[in-house]
């Protein structure tokens, strides 16, 4: 079980690909290792299913908590459903792999990547993507690879290849680039308002490293004596005759529909459906032994698929040769835009409605307390999430009916992209300590709903009074490539996404890019073409941003009356235990007395949440009193809180008490404490002593009462005593 290992070094870090040792019954397998991170990737192919018209590819990413030396916290102590992070990595594998399989393939394909060991310095996702390509090649599956992926970070002015988790958090860029020998096939990025030139340079930097990993895969195949299987479409004479028949009988009528630029999407779809129905009737009237009729009768979907292929061809020709899109727009023109803020009652903390053409997204923003942060129950060692973006895509948004189920991979992916786009402009936690949740409801979809979610989120957050550093907008770019002819499309709609070769989403502020996501339907593009798309997206983004700012030009200065009020301040971390008290009694008493919610971080940051600002301030005074250091000799005016036979307790600061011994109540002898003071009395005391246990001993002797002497500390606002 020795296997074969190929190693490659990047910036002093070695990546190892081991084949022929693990999972011998899988079609192909490879162990990808870097540092102490190890990911086993397998690819398996089984017999195709009858009657399907798509590639049945499944990509899974599995996390095992033993990889980080942990035991699951569930009742069964076993991993449950994949966490969101695993879903996103599965999509990261799928997106560059899917376009590299032949369009005619109908065999079931499954790629499974399992993280067996995780080094916090080496993220596992890009290893899994590269491993998917290697395993597929070893399985002798028709595949237009090799393909590889790397991550690029930016620390200061230097690009870093495959940075650690900490370097990603500290840097201004988190970019994943996947490519083939033909060019870049996938890009995923989050950036801190980075200039376009820097992002393009990073993509070029990453693609150079991708080429090295591609060579390593080719070397493994050569050393193992495995010849890569080249995709060769099966010859189906009947389908060829059907294509010829449709081209002869339908091209003119389809072309006329595509040139009716003023029609709506529904009208265009209806006319195309009518042409297809009429064609089906004509085919049904042909002789029974006619090859075209036999082809359609043999497979109910073959007519629909060939009709779509012809429509795609004609639409692409119209764009390439005439520069005309199906709705009459120029190649760089954005659809009509409308936006509004505050469209829902203020019980919703913030709301925004964004519409571009037929794409309409309603976003809402909710402000929560630090305890609402999401704990990440996965292998990723990152902190709690304090900004959440959830994306919903109901069936009515495309005029369809289907059961409403929990969010799928697409919803998770689109929500993550919109989340990435907004995070760089969120206010610092110490000045705005709220946990934020944005939900984007897609009310109507005709292309680029994820970028519509970004725009709607900006409107909702500004309406909620979140002081964003800058507003963010986004646009989706498309591409049509026919041989050497390339046309880049701005703000693609649904049919252009479906029939085009690229879906490139670009989000950012007027100063720079915050998120990118590029998916291809071809085997790769040169970086130069990607740069053209990024540059063409900027005027569109700025135009969209200007339209959004017409609805709300700055964050609101007040929060919704139904949003919680937060106070945040810092205390000495060594005094956290004083605030919490034995068994949590002190902090529980403060929250019950003031009707507030209090969170304390390990670093000493205290956050108080309440719907009543005065109550939050009262809780703050108590905590500041508990943590304020007092000194012997200081004079305070306080309230008698309780009396015992040997003395009286005085609250000298909110939450901080000292005791006056009976002998310190007066210069004369005192028989009973309540002969001198009673509960509720206001007295001026001096700190006589602080013992080695921190107990404060007070005295009334020699201390003028009734404000006859200047106090070293102003009298605190009276509050009820702690239990």
Swiss-Prot record:
Keywords: Cytoplasm, Magnesium, Metal-binding, Nucleotidyltransferase, RNA-binding, Transferase
Main subcellular location of this protein, as a coarse class: cytoplasm
Domain S1 motif: 633-701
Domain KH: 564-623
Region (Disordered): 701-723
Gene Ontology cellular component annotations, sorted alphabetically: cytosol
Binding site for Mg(2+): 497, 503
Subcellular location(s) per record: Cytoplasm
Cofactor dependence: Mg(2+)
InterPro entries, alphabetized: ExoRNase_PH_dom1 (IPR001247), ExoRNase_PH_dom2 (IPR015847), ExoRNase_PH_dom2_sf (IPR036345), KH_dom (IPR004087), KH_dom_type_1 (IPR004088), KH_dom_type_1_sf (IPR036612), NA-bd_OB-fold (IPR012340), PNPase (IPR012162)
Catalytic function, reaction form: RNA(n+1) + phosphate = RNA(n) + a ribonucleoside 5'-diphosphate
UniProt record similarity statement: Belongs to the polyribonucleotide nucleotidyltransferase family.
Function of the molecule: Involved in mRNA degradation. Catalyzes the phosphorolysis of single-stranded polyribonucleotides processively in the 3'- to 5'-direction.
Protein name: Polyribonucleotide nucleotidyltransferase
Native species: Prochlorococcus marinus (strain MIT 9313)
Source lineage: Bacteria, Bacillati, Cyanobacteriota, Cyanophyceae, Synechococcales
């Amino acid at each position: 079980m020795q296997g074969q290992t190929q190693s490659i070094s990047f910036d002093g870090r070695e990546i190892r690909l081991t084949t022929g040792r693990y999972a011998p019954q899988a079609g192909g397998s490879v162990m990808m290792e870097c540092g102490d991170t190890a990911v086993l990737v397998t690819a398996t192919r089984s017999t195709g299913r009858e009657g399907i018209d798509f590639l049945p590819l499944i990509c899974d990413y599995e996390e095992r908590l033993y990889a980080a030396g942990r035991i699951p916290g569930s009742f069964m102590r076993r991993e449950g459903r994949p966490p969101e992070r695993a879903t996103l990595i599965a999509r990261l594998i799928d997106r560059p792999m899917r376009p590299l399989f032949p369009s005619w393939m109908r065999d079931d394909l499954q790629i499974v990547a399992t993280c067996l060991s995780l080094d916090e310095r080496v993220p596992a996702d890009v290893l899994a993507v590269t491993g998917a390509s290697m395993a597929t090649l070893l399985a002798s599956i028709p595949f237009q690879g090799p393909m590889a992926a790397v991550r690029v970070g930016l620390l200061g002015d230097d690009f870093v290849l495959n940075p650690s988790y900490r370097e990603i958090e500290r840097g201004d860029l988190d970019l994943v680039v996947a490519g083939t020998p033909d060019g870049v096939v996938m890009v995923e990025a989050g950036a801190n308002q980075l200039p376009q030139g820097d992002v393009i340079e990073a993509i070029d930097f990453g693609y150079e490293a991708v080429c090295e990993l591609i060579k390593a895969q080719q070397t493994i195949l050569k050393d193992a004596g495995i010849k890569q299987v080249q995709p060769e479409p099966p010859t189906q004479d009947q389908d060829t005759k059907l294509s010829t028949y449709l081209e002869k009988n339908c091209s003119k009528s389809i072309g006329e529909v595509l040139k009716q630029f003023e029609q709506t999407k529904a009208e265009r779809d209806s006319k195309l459906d009518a042409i297809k129905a009429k064609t089906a009737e004509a085919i049904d009237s042909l002789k029974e032994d006619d090859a075209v009729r036999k082809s359609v009768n043999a497979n109910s979907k073959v007519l629909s698929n060939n009709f779509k292929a012809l429509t795609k061809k004609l639409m692409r020709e119209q764009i390439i040769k005439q520069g005309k899109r199906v709705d009459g727009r120029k190649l760089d023109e954005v659809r009509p835009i409308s936006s509004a803020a505050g469209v829902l009652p203020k019980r919703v903390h913030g709301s925004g409605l964004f519409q571009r053409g037929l794409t309409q997204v309603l976003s809402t923003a909710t402000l929560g307390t630090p305890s609402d942060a999401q704990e990440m129950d996965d292998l990723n060692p990152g902190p709690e999430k304090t900004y959440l973006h959830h994306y919903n895509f109901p069936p009515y948004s495309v005029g369809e009916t289907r059961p409403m189920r929990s969010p799928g991979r697409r919803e998770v992916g689109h929500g993550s992209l919109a989340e990435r786009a907004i995070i760089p402009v969120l206010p610092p936690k110490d000045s705005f300590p709220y946990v934020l949740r944005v939900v984007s409801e897609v009310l109507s979809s005709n292309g680029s709903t994820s970028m519509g979610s970004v725009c709607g989120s900006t409107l909702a957050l500004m309406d909620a009074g979140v002081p964003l550093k800058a507003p963010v907008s986004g646009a989706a770019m498309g591409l049509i490539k026919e041989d050497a002819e390339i046309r880049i499309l701005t703000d693609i709609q649904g049919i252009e996404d479906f029939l085009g070769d690229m879906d490139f989403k670009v989000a950012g502020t007027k100063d720079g890019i915050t998120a990118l996501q590029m998916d291809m339907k071809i085997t790769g593009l040169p970086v130069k073409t990607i740069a053209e798309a990024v540059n063409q997206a900027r005027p569109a983004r700025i135009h969209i941003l200007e339209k959004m700012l017409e609805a709300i030009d700055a964050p609101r200065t007040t929060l919704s009356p139904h949003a919680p009020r937060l106070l945040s301040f810092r205390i000495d971390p060594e005094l956290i235990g004083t605030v919490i008290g034995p068994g949590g009694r002190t902090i529980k008493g403060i929250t019950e007395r003031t009707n507030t919610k209090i969170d304390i971080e390990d670093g000493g940051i205290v956050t108080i949440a309440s719907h009543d600002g005065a109550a939050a301030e009262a809780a703050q005074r108590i905590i500041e009193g508990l943590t304020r250091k007092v000194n012997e000799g200081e004079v305070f005016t306080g309230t008698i809180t309780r009396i015992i036979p040997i003395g009286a307790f005085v609250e000298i600061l909110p939450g901080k008490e000292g005791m006056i011994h009976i002998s310190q109540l007066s210069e004369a002898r005192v028989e009973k404490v309540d002969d001198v003071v009673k509960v509720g009395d206001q007295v001026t005391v001096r700190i006589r002593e602080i013992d080695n246990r921190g107990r404060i001993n007070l005295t009334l002797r020699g201390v003028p009462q009734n404000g006859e002497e200047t106090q070293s500390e102003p009298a605190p606002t009276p509050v009820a005593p702690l239990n």
